[in-house]
């Protein structure tokens, strides 16, 4: 056998090695069946479990905001909200957007708790320290020390005389 035939034989054996043997020694090799789960199947299972909890719909909710510790917000616009009071369970379904807390201002201020308000104050302090252009303060610009108005007034008086 030449080297090309050996290389082809090795590739063929490696391809066969990937297959899963089902059954005994004499049975042919078969590919393992992979079942792909879809979001619709998960949604059906979730809805059936919610029916077991006897959930009730809560109408009239326009938006739901879930605030994370890192300052991001999961925002649901016109969600379907269901609750089960005996099970202490709430279900929020709908399309969700991940947004920064600064994008949601000022409408989200009345929804913030004390922890989120302190986080927001820290963010505001960081922004003011950086300045409007996002860079630190310029160190090249000297600070004003004296009163320049008095010198200009003296010049105008000298010009009048």
From Swiss-Prot:
GO BP terms, alphabetized: embryo development ending in birth or egg hatching; negative regulation of apoptotic process; negative regulation of protein localization to endoplasmic reticulum; regulation of cellular response to heat
Extent of the signal sequence: none
Subcellular location per the Swiss-Prot or TrEMBL entry: Nucleus; Cytoplasm; Mitochondrion
Keywords linked to the UniProt accession: Cytoplasm, Mitochondrion, Nucleus, Transcription, Transcription regulation
Xref: InterPro entries: BTF3, NAC_A/B_dom_sf, Nas_poly-pep-assoc_cplx_dom
Domain NAC-A/B: 40-105
GO cellular component, one term: nascent polypeptide-associated complex
Disruption phenotype: RNAi-mediated knockdown mostly results in embryonic lethality, but embryos that do hatch produce larvae with a large number of apoptotic cell corpses, which are first present at the comma stage of development. Surviving animals are uncoordinated. RNAi-mediated knockdown results in increased neuronal and intestinal cell death and a reduced number of male tail rays in larvae. RNAi-mediated knockdown in larvae results in increased survival and mobility in response to a constant temperature of 36 degrees Celsius, when compared to wild-type.
Chain residue ranges for the region called Disordered: 16-41, 128-161
Residue runs in coiled coils: none
Compositional bias ranges of the Basic residues kind: 27-36
Main localization of the protein described in the UniProt heading: nucleus
SMART domains referenced in this protein's UniProt entry, alphabetically: NAC
Entry keyword annotation includes Disulfide bond: no
Family note: Belongs to the NAC-beta family.
Subunit structure of this chain's protein: May be part of the nascent polypeptide-associated complex (NAC), which is a heterodimer of icd-2 and icd-1 (via NAC-A/B domains).
Descriptive protein name: Transcription factor BTF3 homolog
Organism: Caenorhabditis elegans
Lineage summary: Eukaryota, Metazoa, Ecdysozoa, Nematoda, Chromadorea
């Amino acid at each position: 056998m030449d080297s090309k035939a050996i290389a082809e034989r090795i590739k063929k054996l490696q391809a066969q090695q990937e297959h899963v043997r089902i059954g005994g020694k004499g049975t042919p090799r078969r590919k393992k069946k992979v079942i792909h789960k879809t979001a619709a199947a998960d949604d059906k299972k979730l809805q059936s479990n919610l029916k077991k909890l006897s959930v009730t719909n809560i109408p009239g909710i326009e938006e739901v905001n879930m605030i994370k510790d890192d300052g991001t917000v999961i925002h649901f616009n016109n969600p379907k909200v269901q609750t089960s009071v005996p099970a202490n369970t709430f279900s929020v379904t709908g399309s969700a957007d991940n947004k920064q807390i600064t994008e949601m201002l000022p409408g989200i201020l009345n929804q913030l708790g004390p922890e989120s308000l302190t986080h927001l104050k820290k963010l505001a302090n960081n922004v003011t320290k950086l300045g409007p252009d996002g860079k630190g303060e310029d160190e090249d610009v000297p600070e004003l020390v004296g009163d320049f108005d008095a010198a200009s007034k003296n010049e105008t008086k000298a010009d009048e005389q």
